[in-house]
């Protein structure tokens, strides 16, 4: 499976949950320079290294996401930005996963934790692509997730204050109950998005994560 690894505490816990069930996985991260920094990318690399004792050797794929994200920001209704961005990320992750012959995506989403994680928003997000989306944290609250992150050794890295692309351009009042019809209408008004997503998927950076890499931290 391919785990969507952000810089927060949720997605490393999701990876750990699936790895302990014996699922082999790789990670994918979305970077949007200059809005996100090199240090933010290195933070995610460090998280992947901290997880390697559970996941085994794997690859971190870093997606250059600036162009798709700017395009959505400039062409979509502000209140739908977050769900449209999540759909875009899943489509790119789907393309990368299928090239690797992986069978599912993993996210750290927790029900109703933020606006993009309501039932309505998740239903709209899932429809964007056709791989199963595994959400092992879906029924956990933030305290449970943080407690696990402390146990597995990712908490301190997760709280380092570096931005990630999920938090830039976030509207002040995102819609929590979007309908699929309005999401599809918004995407129909962005005919250039698919090409930008394909370009991003083709130009991923590969960072190989190996047992013993923690000695280099």
Map each language-model feature to its residues:
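Peripheral terminal appendages
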Residues: 1-2, 58, 102, 118, ...
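Structural beta-sheet core signal
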Residues: 3, 27-29, 62, 107, ...
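ATP-dependent adenylation/pyrophosphate-handling site
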Residues: 1-44, 166, 172
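Active-site adenylate/phosphate-handling loop in enzymes that bind or generate adenylated species
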Residues: 65, 69-70, 74-147, 151-152, ...
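Conserved beta-strand segments of alpha/beta enzyme cores
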Residues: 24, 59-61, 132
